[in-house]
């Protein structure tokens, strides 16, 4: 059974349990302050939750996409920004086997997958900055930076 109210849709399984809820704007999954798509397994356990803006997976501060196995165990958690896997302070994609053991953890920035080492070293100033020759001003005096042998 399907119930449509404006751009909000609810579907039910034949057994009467809720199947899914969807929020739309201009034909695209969209909800600014909440979950745009939520689904359940036929047994009534939650299946997935998705935050979307204009059809794209998007959430600035939190998990964007979550899913669970029919037994209630977590399946995956994903962080998206503007439709791309992205998380600046940790794992962006994490998945579990049905028994609850972790099977994958991935780091992503702006849709690009990074190794754990690349992610942890991305702001390492020693590898990305060469200040030699730069002029700095301290208390009105200018100084030219140079490398000191160690």
Predicted features along the sequence, with ranges:
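Glycine/tyrosine- and acidic-biased, solvent-exposed loop/turn segments at the edges of beta-strands
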Residues: 1-142, 147-150
């Amino acid at each position: 059974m399907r119930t449509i109210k404006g751009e909000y849709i609810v579907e039910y399984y034949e057994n009467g349990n809720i199947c899914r809820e969807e929020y739309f704007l201009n034909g695209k999954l969209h909800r600014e302050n909440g979950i745009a798509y939520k689904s359940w397994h036929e047994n009534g356990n939650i299946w997935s939750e998705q935050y979307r803006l204009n059809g794209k997976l998007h959430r600035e501060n939190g998990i964007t996409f979550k899913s669970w196995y029919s037994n209630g165990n977590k399946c995956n958690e994903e962080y998206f920004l503007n439709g791309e896997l992205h998380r600046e302070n940790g794992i962006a994609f994490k998945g579990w086997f049905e028994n609850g053991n972790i099977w994958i953890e991935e780091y992503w920035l702006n849709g690009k997958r990074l190794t754990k080492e690349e992610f942890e070293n991305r702001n390492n100033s020693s590898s990305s900055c060469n200040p030699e020759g730069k002029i700095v001003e301290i208390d009105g005096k200018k100084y030219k930076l140079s490398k000191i042998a160690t």
